[in-house]
Structures are given as structure tokens and as C-alpha cells.
Amino acid sequence: MAGKRDKVRMISTAGTGHFYTTDKNKKNTPGKMEFSKYDPVVRKHVPYKEGKIK
């Protein structure tokens, strides 16, 4: 039986191509996640949006 959590890729909105990977419970958070994290390429905190893992 499949797990309840999906792996997702958090992609920087700064356009640097930097991303973090995490997982989310698709039952509790059905929408797209978005939060602020540190982007080492631009050396500041920027919003990261959820994307698919290829």
C-alpha cells in the first residue's frame, strides 16, 4: 500500500534554479506549499514554491 506522503521539490522564485526536496501529507495539505527559505545563490531568503520531482 502506498504511503500517505508525497515527495515534492521546493523551487526558488528567484530564478536561480536552486531547490530543496521535502515531503508533504497530501491529505492535510491538498494545495501547493509556499514558504520562505534561504537561497545560497543570491544569499538571501526568498519564497520557494512547490514543484514536481522529475
From Swiss-Prot:
Per UniProt, the keywords (alphabetical) are: Ribonucleoprotein, Ribosomal protein
Establish whether keyword Ribonucleoprotein is in the entry: yes
Q: What is any Pfam family matched here?
A: Ribosomal_L33
Cellular component terms (Gene Ontology): cytosolic large ribosomal subunit
Q: Which SUPFAM superfamilies does its entry note?
A: Zn-binding ribosomal proteins
| TM region(s), chain numbering | none
MF term (GO), any: structural constituent of ribosome
Task: Report any one BP term from Gene Ontology.
Answer: translation
Sequence similarity: Belongs to the bacterial ribosomal protein bL33 family.
Matching PANTHER family: 54S RIBOSOMAL PROTEIN L39, MITOCHONDRIAL, LARGE RIBOSOMAL SUBUNIT PROTEIN BL33M
Protein's name according to its UniProt entry: Large ribosomal subunit protein bL33
Originating organism:
Stenotrophomonas maltophilia (strain R551-3)
Q: Which gene is this protein's source? A: rpmG
